[in-house]
């Protein structure tokens, strides 16, 4: 692509500051009588919004160094006045859900079974074997989330945690070109971090929260959410510790989705389940993480290979989507419809 054509590409419509309808910055607690020093202690502990304080268990707040039990009660009271945590009517909830944005996947057929695309404000899990299209779909979403709302985008940046070293900026440039976006701007709007162990992966979420306070993000990707758990925890002896660590990580992801309204997309590896039935039907594959992963995901998608570059996505579980399948294709332009 020549430099002259690059200048003709549209820049993604990203808002540099959080919208007025976004979460309350943690500094808002000062207006409710919380001392600036205590607010700083909350922020240093990774609590960057009033919502994050309101959603935290009291025992977690008590663990913050330098904040007494009396101060914790005062902080909780102040946060609860700013963030409504009580009952609301189903009609109000319905009105709120009508405003939820879906991010296009790049394939109309896939968008159709997802009721418009990947839902913001919730966790979507994609699992499947190697080369089933999980990472390619994540790359495509990093571009489409930056599109205008009327084009199926979220007008926000993307945040990508890479646990397997499979993120490729060149793919982002190719996909941006397909959508007529300036490649350099699109890359600038993707915040990337490589995760090296499960503790590091969790710490990156604290950094992500502070970034989301500063500017609008529409998408957060963790590829893969379980890869490091398979290496950091081994054997049945560490299974309980692994599941507890994974549950806390997934809960932190859900809090980010709740606080900032981002679409959280996590990929998951699979393992072959070999039992007596497998002798006749072949080994069945199941996603890693067990019930903890299954319950944490709002929408669960199973991706598998088709013929050539064709892939098949099946909705496994969702509170609002019917069980259905869609075909899509992986090309140099990312995820597209199958060309028959």
From Swiss-Prot:
Highly expressed in mitotic and meiotic tissues, but low levels in differentiated tissues. It is found in: Nucleus. SMART domains: AAA. ATP binds at residues 128-135. Gene3D superfamilies: 5' to 3' exonuclease, C-terminal subdomain, P-loop containing nucleotide triphosphate hydrolases. InterPro entries: AAA+_ATPase (IPR003593), DNA_recomb/repair_Rad51 (IPR011941), DNA_recomb/repair_Rad51_C (IPR013632), DNA_recomb/repair_RecA-like (IPR016467), DNA_repair_Rad51/TF_NusA_a-hlx (IPR010995), P-loop_NTPase (IPR027417), RecA_ATP-bd (IPR020588), RecA_monomer-monomer_interface (IPR020587). GO terms for cellular component: condensed nuclear chromosome. GO terms for biological process: chromosome organization involved in meiotic cell cycle; DNA recombinase assembly; DNA strand invasion; mitotic recombination; mitotic recombination-dependent replication fork processing; reciprocal meiotic recombination. SUPFAM superfamilies: P-loop containing nucleoside triphosphate hydrolases, Rad51 N-terminal domain-like. Residues 1-22 are annotated as: Disordered. Residues 49-78 form the HhH domain. CDD domains: Rad51. It comes from the Eukaryota. Keywords: ATP-binding, DNA damage, DNA recombination, DNA repair, DNA-binding, Nucleotide-binding, Nucleus. One of its GO terms (molecular function) is ATP binding. Its main location: nucleus. PROSITE patterns: RECA_2, RECA_3. Self-associates and may interact with XRCC3 homolog. Belongs to the RecA family. RAD51 subfamily. PANTHER family: DNA REPAIR PROTEIN RAD51 HOMOLOG 1 (PTHR22942:SF39), RECA/RAD51/RADA DNA STRAND-PAIRING FAMILY MEMBER (PTHR22942). Binds to single and double-stranded DNA and exhibits DNA-dependent ATPase activity. Unwinds duplex DNA. Component of the meiotic recombination pathway. Seems to play a role in mediating chromosome homology search, chromosome pairing and synapsis at early stages and probably chromosome crossing-over at later stages in meiosis. Probably is involved in the repair of meiotic double strand breaks (DBSs) and in homologous recombination. This is DNA repair protein RAD51 homolog B.
């Amino acid at each position: 692509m020549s430099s002259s054509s690059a200048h003709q590409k549209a820049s993604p419509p990203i808002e540099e500051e959080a919208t007025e309808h976004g979460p309350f910055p943690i500094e808002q607690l000062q207006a409710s009588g919380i001392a600036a020093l205590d607010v700083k202690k909350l922020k240093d502990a990774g609590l960057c919004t009033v919502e994050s304080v309101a959603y935290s268990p009291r025992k977690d707040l008590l663990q913050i160094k330098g904040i007494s039990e009396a101060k914790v009660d005062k902080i909780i009271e102040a946060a609860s006045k700013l963030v409504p945590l009580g009952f609301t009517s189903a009609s109000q909830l319905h009105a709120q859900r009508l405003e939820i944005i879906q991010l296009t996947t790049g394939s109309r057929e896939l968008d159709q079974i997802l009721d418009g695309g990947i839902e913001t404000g919730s966790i979507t899990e994609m699992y499947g074997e190697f080369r089933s299209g999980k990472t390619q779909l994540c790359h495509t979403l990093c571009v489409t989330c930056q599109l205008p709302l009327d084009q199926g985008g979220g007008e926000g940046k993307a945040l990508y945690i890479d646990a397997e070293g499979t993120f490729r900026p060149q793919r982002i440039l190719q996909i941006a070109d397909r959508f007529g976006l300036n490649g350099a701007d699109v890359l600038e709007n993707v915040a990337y971090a490589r995760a090296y162990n499960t503790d590091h992966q969790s710490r990156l979420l604290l950094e992500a929260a502070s970034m989301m306070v500063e500017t609008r993000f529409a998408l957060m990707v963790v590829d893969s959410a379980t890869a490091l758990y398979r290496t950091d925890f081994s054997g049945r002896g560490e299974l309980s510790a692994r599941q507890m660590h994974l549950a806390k990580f997934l809960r932190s992801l859900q809090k980010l989705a709740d606080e900032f309204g981002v679409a959280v997309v996590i990929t998951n590896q699979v393992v072959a389940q070999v039992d007596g039935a497998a002798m006749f039907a072949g080994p069945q594959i199941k996603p890693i993480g067990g019930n903890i992963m299954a319950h944490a995901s709002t929408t669960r998608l199973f991706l598998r290979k088709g013929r050539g570059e064709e892939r098949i996505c099946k909705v496994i579980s969702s509170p609002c989507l019917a069980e259905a399948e869609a075909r899509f294709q992986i090309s140099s332009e990312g995820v597209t419809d199958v060309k028959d």
